[in-house]
Amino acid sequence: MSEPDVKSHKIEFPCDDYPIKVIGDTVVGFKDTVIEILSKHAKVDLSTLAERQSKEGKYTTVQLHIVAESENQLHDINSALRATGIVKMVL
């Protein structure tokens, strides 16, 4: 039996509709902090904004789309978000 043909899914830049999901502690201003950081690094489409809290209310998820220009830009966004201390994961 042969291995299935698995293709690597590479992002083609620029990507005008790149989804970002940020998970972090539920604190006052979490959504605004995420938007502020993303806006410093990329064009943000606020019409795609979605916010949700975990069942217990401990974590908040903010989702939206940005214009992704490069791998370096995505790395910088991840680093800036994680540096806040309130962001647990960036997907």
From Swiss-Prot:
Pfam families: DUF493. It comes from the Bacteria. GO terms for cellular component: cytosol. Belongs to the UPF0250 family. NCBIfam families: PRK00341.1. This is UPF0250 protein Pput_4677. The lineage of its organism: Bacteria, Pseudomonadati, Pseudomonadota, Gammaproteobacteria, Pseudomonadales.
